[in-house]
Design a protein with these regions (language model features):
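N-terminal, positively charged nucleic-acid-binding surface of large information/translation enzymes
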Residues: 2-168
Length: 168
């Protein structure tokens, strides 16, 4: 009989601040799923981690009077320790600043680029730093983000796009 496999991951969290109830809730749900599948005898891999490459992290480091790497290292330790204290049963904790993560992403990117699945194009939009997202004009009220009440940055930048339409 083939042993069933189950993979669960949380979002990789921004480390601009300490974990909060929302991040705990998401991680707890993933932990419950992982434990349930382990109880059923399935082979489980549960991944969580931190995204240390965001504008929010840069701003938080600046506000704390620290270099970005120093700040994200400190915050990543807090996130890892929090999950340990809460007995989260993850099998791995990945940080986007780790060599292994960067090598894996580079390898994946290179493969899809070679297949022609990645192409360069121009993206024009309104970027809200607070939301860490691009907004449309319809998302704005009086030219401001509805959530943060701030004017988003008008950005035009060259980006890489994934040709998802090939995989319909």
């Amino acid at each position: 009989m083939v042993k069933l496999r189950f993979y669960v991951t949380t979002p990789i969290y921004y480390v601009n601040d300490k974990p909060h109830i929302g991040s705990f809730y998401t991680t707890l749900i993933a932990d419950i799923l992982a434990r349930w599948h382990r109880l059923k005898g399935e082979e489980v891999f549960f991944l969580t981690g931190t995204d240390e490459n965001s504008q929010k992290n840069v701003e938080a480091a600046k506000n704390a009077g620290k270099e970005v790497r120093e700040y994200v290292d400190e915050m990543a330790r807090i996130w890892q320790e929090t999950w340990r204290m809460l007995d989260i049963s993850s099998d791995d904790f990945v940080r986007t600043t780790e060599d292994r993560h960067q090598k894996a992403v580079y390898g994946f990117f290179r493969r899809v680029l070679e297949r022609g699945d990645i192409y360069k194009g121009k993206y024009v939009g309104y970027y809200c730093v607070g939301c860490e997202a691009f907004l449309t004009k319809q998302d704005l009220v009086d030219g401001k983000c509805l959530i943060h009440k701030t004017e988003p940055m008008a950005l035009e930048e060259e980006n890489y796009f994934f040709a998802a339409s090939r995989y319909k």
